[in-house]
Amino acid sequence: MTVPRLVEQFELGLDAPICLTWELTYACNLACVHCLSSSGRRDPRELTTAECKDVIDTLQRMQVFYVNIGGGEPTVRPDFWELVDYATAHQVGVKFSTNGIKVDAGAALRLAASDYVDVQISLDGATAEVNDAVRGAGSYATAVRAMDNLKAAGFAGFKISVVMTRHNIGQLDQLKALADSYGAQLRLTRLRPSGRGADTWHQLHPEAGQQRQLYDWLASRGEQVLTGDSFFHLAPYGGPLPGLNLCGAGRVVCLIDPVGDVYACPFAIHEEFLAGSVRQAGGFEAVWRDSALFAELRRPAARGEGEAGGACRSCEFFDSCRGGCMAAKFFTGLPLDGPDPECVRGYGAEALKAADPVTAPRPALDHSHRSAPVPVMIGPRPGGPPGRACDENPLAGFAAAASRSR
């Protein structure tokens, strides 16, 4: 099948997602200022172990290639390893994201022994100063310790996942060198105004000149650096980058959240993009097949094509950027058929000037340890000891829930 034909098939939707993101829990030991799911505290309605296994059975029947497991911090679920083992035993590969808190020497050996599990360590700076400013004091050291354990265990090719901000764009070469030193692969992702990122996006997202710097750097690295579907909005600078150069929401990807709700995109956790629940009749398969939202997203008009096309359809670069990221537009208050807020031609920046941030949609749920926006602190470190990341145990209620699920 030719590449254009394959892209067309992706846009029309597949019988099953190529992969899906599954947030196992909102519990997390950190309070990252840009967390897409506003994680921190566990939701008592979380899927039980038995319900999670039912979802895995469905994914096996649908022949889903693999699942991206995240959170929160997924490894703090007491049944995390049980679910990973169950998935791989049922031909569903697992890639999970972690801040490294539970990746000790024993866990690293366990991971290195599996052919069907991949791990990516979240790290948002090549130095502790830059990383800890957004991920919290001590998080850099935790990630490095996890990477040391993985390297010592012989786990080759694990991923280092970096959310690009205006503060770490200048560290691209350092980040690549860090990944190379561990025999790891660097993965860069776009900062979206989702979750707590809605409060910090304007402070953190790369500026126009940095976007061009990022594009040129990625273009020169080819497939050495993974990007997923993060940067297709930059394609008008000179052509598509390696990766998925289209919005796959509801077509080839989607999200299952900790309580079983299914959203079109991991970055669009809002009732506007809620497709259903794995707890409803027919489970996940019925949601993927029959959701009215997914059917709408798979229509050509929903992508800005045809007579019903949006404002971007007349742009000469539309075939390159496809109008950009749905979630980025939605949570900055821009119309879905208009330009991406980081449109390389500047149309998004102009649209943002006219948009009212007060009326922009807010993320649906907030499980943060704090209820107020968390300021971004880039600069000299305070002289005193860091404050506690949270004043309550993020695992509260886990023991009882785990025993009920057996």
Predicted regions located by residue number:
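Accessory C-terminal segments flanking Radical SAM cores
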Residues: A184, D229-E350
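Short beta->alpha junction loops/turns
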Residues: T25, G40, E73, G100-I101, ...
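Conserved alpha-helical substructure of the radical SAM core
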Residues: M1-D118
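Flexible, acidic/Gly-rich N-terminal and inter-domain linker regions that tether
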Residues: M1-C19, L30-A31, A360-R362, D366-H367, ...
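Residue-level preference for beta-strand/loop junctions
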Residues: A16, T88, A156, C247-G248, ...
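Radical SAM enzyme [4Fe-4S]-AdoMet core and its adjacent flexible, acidic
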Residues: M1, L47, A113-V117, S122-Y263, ...
